[in-house]
Amino acid sequence: MIIQKIEFNDKKDKFVIETDTKESFLLSYNDFEKFKIHNEMIIDDELYAHLLNISKFGEAFDISLNFLSYKLRTEKEIITKLKSKKFSTEIIDDVITKLKNLDLLDDYNYAKIFINDKINLTNYSKRRIINDLYQKGIDKKIYEDYLEEVFGYNMELDKATLIVETKINIWKEKYEGYELKNKIFTFLLQKGFSYDVAKQISGMY
């Protein structure tokens, strides 16, 4: 295999290498210099496989950086994104490792920010927060100590109270007595609030 054409792609900030077999791959300036790439250079199968792997890693890493540029992501979200682009497991693992080493990917930090946002901006129950983080691929063990520290029983009680207050006038027109209590109790359970919270709030009506 012989290198027949070398161009620099300004948009991607990388060299585009083409061979006599119509294969092509991208290399950063550092890798281009490291391997002393030049026209008419003969590349054996082993070197080509290595350069192609470097090219694929660079492509996957660039996609991840762009994906992260919009907002914080979880490890699962990055993996799902790269899998959708058909990258190998080896490449994906290497990208995840590099992102973590650069402090660009941290599920614990993501969970803390997510929890704080939901506490300050919503009336989500603790269970709702846990379920949402689970959907994002973050195991409860990663953040459970922090969640327990910042989201206690009284806070959940307050949030449940606020939610019920937005509904109670409508419900009172339809229900009374046991039916009203049951409506409140069931509603709060469906929203992810604990049995104790649901029982205490419904007992107030």
From Swiss-Prot:
Gene Ontology CC, one term: cytoplasm
Name of the protein described by the UniProt record: Regulatory protein RecX
Gene Ontology BP annotations: regulation of DNA repair
Purpose: Modulates RecA activity.
Keyword list, A-Z: Cytoplasm
Domain of life: Bacteria
Family annotation (InterPro entries): RecX_HTH_1st, RecX_HTH_2nd, RecX_HTH_3rd, Regulatory_RecX, WH-like_DNA-bd_sf
Any single Pfam family the record assigns to this protein: RecX_HTH2
Location in the cell: Cytoplasm
Family the entry assigns: Belongs to the RecX family.
Gene it is expressed from: recX
